[in-house]
Each structure stands twice: as C-alpha cells, then as structure tokens.
Amino acid sequence: MHGGLTKALRSSRLARRSVHSHALAAEANRATNALVSLKFPDSPPAEKGPLSGLRIAVKDNIVTRDFPTTCSSNVLKNFVSPFDATVVHRIRENGGQIIGKANCDEFGMGSLNTYTIHGPVINPFPLSKVGLNNDKRSAGGSSGGSAAAVAADICDAALGTDTGGSIRLPASYCGIVGLKPSYGLVSRWGVVSYADSLDCVGVLARDVETTSCVFERISEYDPNDPTSALPETREKADALSSQRLDELSSALAEGSLHGLRIGIPQEFFPSELSNHVLNRFRQSVQLLKERGAQIIPVSLPSTSYSLSAYYVLASAEASSNMARYDGIQYGERIPTQDPSDLKKVSTVYARTRSSTFGPEVQRRILLGTYALTADAFDNYFLQAQRVRQLIKDDFDRVFAMPNVRYAQPSNTPAQASQKVDVLLHPSAIRSAPRLDEVETAASSLDAYVQDVLTVPASLAGLPALSIPCPPSSSETEEVEWPIGVSIVGQWGSDHFVLAVGKFLESAASV
C-alpha cells in the first residue's frame, strides 16, 4: 500500500526542493516565527526509508537530543534532552529529517499560540495568498508553530500534540491537514506532559497522503509508554476498519461514497459559530451528499458539557505535572539575594515558579489545584470525570463500529444500519482571529471557547482529522481565510478516518 505512496511523495518533495530553497524556508520562518530552532542538513540524506527526504519539524514539547526543548517556557529555556522521544526516533529510523523545533503555547496550554517566550506565531496564509500585509492573524494553538511551518512550506510535515484541539485548531486556521490519533496509538514517551489522560502526538501536513504516511510510521506499540495500546487491541480495531473499507471499496473505486453513513452531531453548532463557517460546512456536506454519502443527524447530548469538564480535568492534571518544576529537581532556579531564603524551600519554589511560569500556566495550575482540594473534589473533579464517561457513551451509542477497548457485544446488522461510520463537524467556530484582537481580549474565556468543537473527541480519546473545507462557491474578491472540517471516528479507526478524509480532499479539488 505504501510503496507507491512513498515514491510519489519522494518525487514531489524533490520537485518542491528545486523551487523552495533552504534560504526561502528560512525567510518564511522569520516572517511567521514558526520554528524556534532551524537547521537543514548539509547534504541530502541517502534513501533509506519510507520517509526519506521528508523534512519534519517537531513541536517544542517533544524532546530531541540535538535541539533544545523549551516548551516555550522560561523554566526550561536551557534544557537539552540526552535522548530522543520515541516518535522522533521512529521518524529518524524511517529516513525523515528533523529540521527544527516548532513554536507552541507554553507547555501546550493555549489555543492561539500567543503564550510563548518566543513570541506569537503568525499565520502564513496571507504570505502565500496575497503577499505580506498588516492583517496578521493567529496560527492557532497550541501547535501553531507546527501548522505554520507546514503551511509556509518550511517543512513537509510536522509533529504536534493535541490535548483538547491543539492540532486540529491550527490546521483549520492555516488551511492544512491535522490528525489527532486515537489515544494510545502513538507513543507519548519523551513528550513533556500537560494532561496525561488527554495528550496525543499527531501529524500536520499539506495533504492526507503525507499525514497518513507519517502516522503509519509512528503509530506502533511502545513498552516505554504505559498508556500505549496493546498490539492485540490495535489488531482488533484495524480488522474492523479494514472490513468496513472493504465493504465500501467498490463504490470508492468508482469515485462514490454510496453506503457511507456520516453523522452530523446537532450539538456542534453553538451560538458562537460564525455564519461564514456554517455556510462553508454546509457546502462540504452537500458535496458529500452529491457523492452518494448518507447524511444522518445524530445527538450527543452530554457533549454540551464537554468544555467545562475538559478545563477542570486538564487543569487538574496540569497542576500535578507542573509541580516538578520547582528550581530544585527540574527547571531554572531564580537566584536569591538573601542567603537565608535558601533555607526555606517554599521560598525557592515560589520565587522560581512565579518568575518562570507564564500567566496562562499559572492560571491553569491555580484552577487545577482548586479542583483537587477536598472542598471542590466531588463537585468539580469527580463530576467532570462523570461527564467524560457520559461523553464516551454518547459516541459509542452512535457509531456502527464497536469500541474494542471495552468488553461489549457487537452491534447486530439491524442496529449497525441505524448508526454511522464517522461524524462530521466544523473544526473551529471561526476562521483565524487577528492577533491584535487576541491581545486585547477582555478575558481568557474568549480563548477557551475556541476549543468548544474539538474537546469532545479528546475527552473520548477518538481519532479526529481536520481537513480544509472546499473553496466557497460564492464569487468574492476578498481573501477567504481557511476553514476546516473534522472527521471523527470510533477508537482505533484512524485508517478509516484517513480514507474518508482522502476522498473528501479529492472531491473538493475537482
């Protein structure tokens, strides 16, 4: 399957190299602030693997032995890991070139890539479409640097992390493809933790083929990662996906989606959703209907509470993970002028953490610490866990494929016919916001609501692929900023989701 794909990708990369030199890539990086470190190899690598010649950027919260890993935080500004993360090792052993580290929100906490010691990432879309202008917009976050590097053609693909939408939101804003895999399919060993039960390593690229090729090489069982899905669980999920793809293969070969059941979750159209996004999404749905897909409205009632549950759970886990950065065990220590302060451990902690953590990280530590206190534990943390389980149950209820992680009876043919193969929804409530709007926002809640459409799949641990919406059918002289549409599948159906994404991508380009 991947032999022809690998050759095609390699030839397209070589062609692009001739028109996009390292100097142009460096210039694009200066314009976007996408990568915080950038180094191209002195000579082309030998063809030694399926990712040979592929230039890949790595988000700055994934450790690399030859680049600093700062997590965009002062507390780790001088840290260089002695080893590579598992995903980085697999990229290298398959021939990929790691060219640098991508800017991100501090420790992955943010939706607009503005909480960073390296400065905000600028969306490269206007650079490629209308030339450099003053309409500077966010690239999204927290994997904004990864998305911008791909969109600006600085690299062919990038690794990012997605906790509540940090790959899909930037992919939508920058007009590229972004995959958040099923939780546990890609190793987290060597990823600096934000929220362990939610963090996923994923892929951003310009097209679904490249995304799929990179994902294929990094999605293997890793005994070093206690959350890595076991081989037998992966095999069961792959078998179900392959079976469903085989059932649809005849139609797909003829350019049709006949037999594919796509659910439209009714709760994913909040009041904050812009009319422009809604209209573009409707055009995507119409395109799928014209290709023979069956569009089915579905309800996921508990997802209405997902944003609140997510920020309680993620912040609680963050408060625990951030406790290690105290200036004694880990992280930069802020010097003290008074020697007596060194006798007070709490003083060293407080001085280091208040000086090196940014405002958003401090805010989430406070929120998470409060949620874990005795007075708030039942009403906040445990209640959020209950909501999370209800959200998982909602998704399992509408999917035709069973969730192989749980012991449950398979759907009968009659039951399966009333359910859906994938879900489709807008990736974001709007197109990329202007950076000056972000900087003058009255409340951090304005940024939190950007994740309202992406956190349900994160809480359920499901695969979600954001791809660009087809161009608008209306004629206008104004530049249309990118808008993404997300395809969500049952746990472990990542290859099926990618196949549907590939078809929609191809149909949109006709």
UniProtKB/Swiss-Prot annotation:
Keyword ATP-binding assigned: yes
Description of how the protein assembles with itself and partners: Subunit of the heterotrimeric GatCAB amidotransferase (AdT) complex, composed of A, B and C subunits.
Protein name stated in the entry: Glutamyl-tRNA(Gln) amidotransferase subunit A, mitochondrial
Cited HAMAP family: GatA
Any GO BP: mitochondrial translation
Active site: K59, S142, S166
Keyword Nucleotide-binding: yes
NCBIfam families found in the cross-reference section: gatA
SUPFAM superfamilies: Amidase signature (AS) enzymes
GO terms under cellular component: glutamyl-tRNA(Gln) amidotransferase complex; mitochondrion
Keyword field: ATP-binding, Ligase, Mitochondrion, Nucleotide-binding, Protein biosynthesis
